[in-house]
A protein has these predicted regions:
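A conserved mid-protein helix/loop that constitutes part of the nucleotide-sugar donor-binding site
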Residues: 16-24, 204, 208-227, 244-250
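Donor nucleotide-sugar binding/catalytic pocket of nucleotide-sugar-dependent glycosyltransferases
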Residues: 62, 144-191
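Acidic anion/phosphate-binding donor-loop and adjacent secondary structure
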Residues: 68-75, 166-171, 178-202, 370-371
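Short His-centered aromatic/hydrophobic patch
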Residues: 94-100, 119
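Nucleotide-activated donor-binding/catalytic signature segment of Leloir-type glycosyltransferases, i.e.
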Residues: 249-266
């Protein structure tokens, strides 16, 4: 029997949550059953740290242009149509947020029988600053058009949470796929004491991991650390990630003389080892589709603090949700209280197992197997 020709469409295979998920899926999927290709829109600031991983698995990678500007988006759509027509995929699985509309339209025109939209987020980050009103109107128009294209051209609607599904599909029925991770890597690092050697020493270790972007609310996190440093001085926050607000974070850390309390680690591929050396995790995001890094942190034994904009589905027993409205002082007090108590909530093994990458692959396999069959 011929293998199912499966195509993942995404940005460059960087270390962010969505692309790390796709790499984990690639490592677990049945390669005798699936012939896998990645089509990547490699943005200039993306470092494709995982590309060699999928190539080593015998999978193909096809690069198309970046998406900087309208002309390149048109070129991107044209390239997709050519690729899909040539390759004759059985399944196209789009992971490009609202741009999935363009991807799925190209797939339908090329006759791809199964066209999957996967929603990984729960909100659009609207423009701020000069010209924000006009930019926001343009973004809303773009979202309206892309959602129509998605709904008209997809056969399957997937999302990482009910919140992510509502954002992308409105009231249309959609399936929740538990965006999993390789849980064993995280629990094993903790059990064996496999800790990143460059973590700065301190009695109390906090951590955050993720792209340093507006969505993650990083400047608020700096303010939380500033307030926490007034309550106690025995901690350090290990901060893994890079992004467009990295320089602004670094500047605010310096302006508040927080260098003793914040260790900026930049982009890292040893997240299990970083988490293994920490006890508390902070994620004050403005919005999240799920927040898979929270699952990883809880699998590593950390007590987590997340904003109440993060879906409750990310809580597998060791997560406390805090409103952003209580401010940096309120967050700092909550973290300080937890440290003083010395207790850590227990993870629910049954809920955690839902986010094992093997379960994710099983859920997706049921979708992929129905090739050619209208969802």
């Amino acid at each position: 029997m011929a293998r199912i020709r499966l195509c993942y469409v995404t940005h460059g295979l960087s270390s962010n949550g969505i692309e790390s998920l796709l790499v984990s899926i690639a490592q677990q999927i049945d390669r005798e059953k699936y012939d896998v290709t990645f089509v990547l829109a490699l943005d200039p600031d993306v470092i494709p740290v995982h590309e060699e991983t999928v190539l080593a698995l015998g999978m193909r990678v096809i690069h198309v242009c970046d998406l900087d500007g309208l002309a390149k988006k048109r070129r991107y759509a044209s390239s997709l149509r050519r690729i899909f027509a040539k390759e004759q995929f059985d399944v196209v699985h789009a992971n490009m947020d609202l741009l999935n509309g363009i991807v799925l339209r190209a797939a339908k025109k090329a006759g791809v029988p199964r066209r999957i939209c996967h929603s990984h987020n729960s909100k659009t980050q609207y423009a701020v600053g000069k010209g924000a009103v006009l930019k926001k109107l343009a973004q809303r128009a773009y979202r309206f058009v892309m959602r129509r294209l998605i709904l008209r051209n997809s056969t399957d609607l997937l999302g990482c949470s009910e919140l992510a599904n509502a954002y992308m599909y409105g009231r249309r029925p959609a399936t929740v796929i538990h965006n999993g991770t390789q849980l064993q890597k995280f629990s094993d690092a903790r059990k064996t004491g496999d800790i990143a050697p460059d973590l700065r020493r301190a009695p109390v270790h906090l951590c955050t991991v993720g792209r340093v972007s507006a969505q993650k609310n990083p400047l608020f996190l700096v303010d939380v650390i500033a307030e926490l440093s007034k309550l106690r001085q025995d901690f350090v926050l290990h901060w893994a990630g890079t992004g467009e607000l990295y320089d602004a974070v670094e500047a605010r850390v310096e302006a508040n003389a927080l260098q003793p309390y914040v260790q900026l680690l930049g982009m890292r591929t040893d997240v299990p080892q970083i988490l293994a050396g920490c006890s508390y995790f902070l994620l004050p995001s403005l919005f999240e589709g799920l927040g898979i890094v929270l699952i990883e942190a809880q699998a590593s034994g950390l007590t987590c603090f997340a904003s109440d904009a993060v879906p409750e589905a990310a809580d597998v027993g060791a997560c406390r949700f805090l409103p952003l409205e209580i401010g940096a002082k309120g967050w700092a007090k909550a973290v300080d209280d937890a440290i003083r108590s010395g207790t850590h909530p227990e993870v629910d093994p049954a809920r955690l197992r839902l986010y094992d990458i093997r379960n994710t692959v099983e859920e997706l396999d049921r979708v992929y197997e129905n090739r050619g069959e209208k969802a």
